[in-house]
């Protein structure tokens, strides 16, 4: 416990004092998580797994630093209409729709009454390994935003034109029909996009889209918004270092 307290103290100074609301066009960090669970020994991409204990410490650190998690919709509204954001806004996003995003992440954020952003691969709404629709509805009721991550998670830069329409517009339509929410934002699978993909995302009615490019999200690039990937190897110190480095 003393070691945890010392680590928290060591990374406690991050940003200077700021007003209670951010003005229009402020860059905002968007965190990117995948699985909130220990990595199995045979996992091919171990850094996609963040230990639940690390996730709890990271969220506690955000709270101590007075960050205020918001949805991507609130960020978009600030950038486009000037709707105020809270002090130190941050978006906490989760890709694909893993079960642990409900059993671990949702329940942790619920303690703080914080929203998350769930980028759902529609075919991942299944009994084994993914989210069930009833769990997604509980997340929505707690203020979470649901966004589209295609139907089957392909590399969109290499699919045919008809399939591109199905994966992009079809995923939005499926989520809107099932959950009765707007689904205004898109997340590119594996961060893969090109001009053709962006054009289809716009055509499907999305307001903006997130990538896997590293950095703060900025309003000039609404359809290529940067995010901050949180890896299993980051721990608390690496997590804080990423946010501290981008704040400079």
Indicate where each model-derived feature is located.
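Short beta-strand and adjacent tight-turn residues that come in two discontinuous sequence segments
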Residues: 119, 149, 209-211
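Residue-level detector of structured alpha->beta connecting loops
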Residues: 66, 113-115, 143, 205
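C-terminal active-site subregion of NodB/CE4 polysaccharide deacetylases
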Residues: 19-93, 98-100, 154, 158-248
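Bacterial N-terminal signal peptides
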Residues: 5-16
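Short histidine/acidic/glycine/proline-rich micro-motifs that form metal-
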Residues: 122-126, 189-192
């Amino acid at each position: 416990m003393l070691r945890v307290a010392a680590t928290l103290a060591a990374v406690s100074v991050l940003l200077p004092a700021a007003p209670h609301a951010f003005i229009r066009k402020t860059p905002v960090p968007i965190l990117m998580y995948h699985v909130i669970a220990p990595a199995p020994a045979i996992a091919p991409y171990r850094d996609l797994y963040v230990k639940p204990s690390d996730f709890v410490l990271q969220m506690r650190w955000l709270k101590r630093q007075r960050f205020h998690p918001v949805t991507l919709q609130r960020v978009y509204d600030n950038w486009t209409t000037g709707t105020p954001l809270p002090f130190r806004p941050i978006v906490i996003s989760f890709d694909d729709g893993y079960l642990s995003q409900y059993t671990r992440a949702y329940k942790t954020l619920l303690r703080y009454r914080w929203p998350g952003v769930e980028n759902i691969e529609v075919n991942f709404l299944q009994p084994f390994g993914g989210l069930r629709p009833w769990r997604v509805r509980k997340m929505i009721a707690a203020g979470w935003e649901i966004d589209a991550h295609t139907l089957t998670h392909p590399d969109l830069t290499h699919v045919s034109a008809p399939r591109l329409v199905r994966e992009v517009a079809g995923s939005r339509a499926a989520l809107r029909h099932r959950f009765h929410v707007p689904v205004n934002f898109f997340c590119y699978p594996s961060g893969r996009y090109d001009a053709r993909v962006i054009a289809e995302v716009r055509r499907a009615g999305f307001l903006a889209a997130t990538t896997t490019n590293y950095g703060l999200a900025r309003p000039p690039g609404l359809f290529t918004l940067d995010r901050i990937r949180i890896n299993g190897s980051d721990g608390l110190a690496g997590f804080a270092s990423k946010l501290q480095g981008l704040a400079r």
